[in-house]
Design a protein with these regions (language model features):
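Re-entrant/interfacial helical elements at transmembrane boundaries that shape
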Residues: 1-7, 163-167, 199-212, 225, ...
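Structural signal for the C-terminal ends of transmembrane alpha-helices
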Residues: 39-40, 82, 114-122
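Hydrophobic mid-bilayer segments of alpha-helices in multi-pass membrane transport proteins
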Residues: 26-31, 65-76, 92, 97-120, ...
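Hydrophobic alpha-helical transmembrane segments in multi-pass integral membrane proteins
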Residues: 75-83, 143-164, 213, 223, ...
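Core transmembrane alpha-helical segments of multi-pass membrane transporters/permeases
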Residues: 101-106, 128-164, 179-194
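Interfacial loop-to-helix junctions that mark the boundaries of transmembrane helices
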Residues: 10-23, 59-64, 89-106, 130-136, ...
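Hydrophobic alpha-helical transmembrane segments of multi-pass integral membrane proteins
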Residues: 144-145, 173-216, 221, 228-229
């Protein structure tokens, strides 16, 4: 979404993305659950005597440090969502415009500062110096930052991508249904992210999608940006696609045959759902 913001000068609020992503995600999750239940048919016999209350009792009650941390976390999430929500009803209000101008990075940074300042039992909620020095993967952070700028460069007028698409791509797709164009982009994003990294996929595909929309007007800029962001995160297959998939490949309870079989099924279904449901929702936002 940062690529869209860099290219257009406008932002997509987290609330807007949630309106797009939650219904789409729920439908995909339901499809995946049905596939697992009806086709994979896993053995749930070991869960018959599983006692949830026993696990909760072992955790014990939350202490003050945990409660304050949870409060700051949910406050941050609310501050991410509320500006976009208010913008739907009172878009011209000065304080709403001010809240939306900050972006999600400001509130995330503010929450880190708060947790670094708030001290309980003479210890801050988080040790910022320790986290910065030992727990932040600076390589990944720099890679993501470069990726966002790379995506915005694709959309920039100086690179000539928009002019190329307007001159050569626009005539080719002028008579192609919009949903077909979106479906092709969605499939490209899903297949690319499952064999490469999601960051590079989202960067490239969002950049191309926005450039296509700006040069031809065939696709809705907001909707296509959310489609490529969602599809670029739909990792199901290869270890390189996402950390959780890499963990799944190394888990004793899963096999590569299962991962490939059901992963490919989801790779084929995800673009269809995101295009038919997600893109349609995105054009309304």
């Amino acid at each position: 979404l940062g690529v869209y913001e860099s290219a257009t000068g406008q932002s997509i609020s987290l609330f807007t993305y949630l309106l797009f992503g939650i219904p789409t995600g729920i439908i995909l999750f339901a499809i995946m659950a049905l596939i697992i239940r009806l086709i994979a048919k896993p053995d749930f016999g070991k869960f018959k005597n599983f006692d949830v209350s026993r696990v909760l009792d072992q955790q014990g009650p939350m202490d003050l440090r945990e409660k304050v941390t949870v409060f700051v976390f949910f406050l941050t999430v609310l501050l991410w969502i509320i500006p976009g929500f208010l913008k739907l009803f009172i878009p011209d209000a000065a304080f709403v415009k001010a809240l939306n101008s900050y972006g999600i990075t400001f509130w995330a940074t503010l929450s880190v500062v708060l947790m670094g300042i708030i001290s309980i039992d003479n210890k801050p909620l988080i040790d910022v110096r320790d986290i910065v020095n030992k727990h932040i993967n600076w390589g990944i952070l720099i890679f993501i930052s470069i990726g966002v700028y790379f995506g915005s460069v694709i959309c920039a007028e100086e690179t000539g991508v928009n002019a190329f698409m307007s001159a050569y791509i626009s005539p080719l797709i002028s008579h192609v249904p919009t949903m077909a164009v979106v479906l092709i982009i969605a499939y490209a994003a899903v297949f690319m992210t499952n064999f490469a990294s999601n960051v590079s996929t989202i960067t490239v595909m969002t950049g191309l999608g926005v450039a296509l929309g700006m040069s031809t007007g065939v696709v809705n800029l907001v909707a296509i940006s959310m489609v490529t962001s969602f599809c670029g995160s739909a990792a199901y297959l290869m270890p390189s696609s996402f950390a959780v998939i890499a963990m799944l490949h190394g888990n004793e309870y899963s096999s590569k045959n299962q991962i490939y079989k059901y992963g490919i099924i989801m790779m084929l279904l995800t673009p269809l759902v995101v295009t038919l449901i997600g893109y349609t929702l995105g054009t309304m936002l």
